[in-house]
Amino acid sequence: VLVFIETDNGLIGVGEGWTPGASPKALMQTIEEDVGPRLIGQDPRYHTKIFTEVWKTTALNARRGILSIALSAVDLALWDLVGKALQAPVYQLLGAFTDQVPCYASAGLYGKGKDETALAEEMQGYLAQGFSDVKMKVGGVSLEEDVKRVRAVRDAIGPKARLMVDANYTLNVPKSLKMAQAFEPYEIYWLEAPVSPDDVSGQAKVNALSPIPVCGNETETGIDRFRELITHRAVEFVQFDIAACGGISEGRRIADLAAAFHLPCTLHASSTGI
């Protein structure tokens, strides 16, 4: 869902809300009825104040779901407005640590009739397009078949490119550990979302015992959930989506928390390109 916020001088900020498994119509209604009215008459330069006030007024509501996504979309639009008003990109407003970031291609999906050769050619193609690394799906077929898929991709992309795997929360602890051990020879950079996002203790066990570090969890919202993942050492790579976690404002807090525990962050990206 895209959000457009217009100021009285005609500037328009654009934000995005990620709705995995949820109705875009429900998100639109939440933005229009619960969040949007609180923005009328506000100064977008005070976006942190706006975010905090709206967050506080939702203390009795379900923050982890669609409301957090609505706040994310609005927060992104407010940051965009401020950048346009100051004629500066948002990365400069955040301190301009760097003006470029490495990008990997998240692909390698399962498909009818898609064998290892087709998968390998697909992943090679992303490197040819300029992506530095690639990520592929696992956990949707037998472990033996997944090993063949991973081996084919590693052989195709060579030893220098990073290869990540994403199980999309489909495994349990024993299966996750068995998979990690089977994938170890192929130098997997991270194992993403191995178990249910509700099983923090299980994910912590996987992270502690797996030869491949765990990455997660892009479906979480708000710093409190990420604090639980981090303090339980359930992740080695902290992954959040600014179109769901609470926007740039909350994402920055999550990144600062991860830094305090010496954990790197990686951003999950929504699909519109905005």
Please report, for each region that a protein language model flagged, where it lies by residue:
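Catalytic core of soluble alpha/beta enzymes
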Residues: 136, 141-271
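Short, charged beta->alpha transition segments
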Residues: 89-93, 118-125
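Active-site beta->alpha loop and helix N-cap motifs at the rims of alpha/beta catalytic domains
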Residues: 107-120, 143
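N-terminal small/glycine-rich loop or linker at the start of catalytic domains
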Residues: 9, 89-111, 149, 156-162
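Short, Gly/Pro- and small/polar-rich lid/capping loops
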Residues: 1-4
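Catalytic domains of carbohydrate-active enzymes, especially glycoside hydrolases
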Residues: 122-137
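Metal- or metallocofactor-binding catalytic centers and their adjacent structured scaffolds
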Residues: 6-85
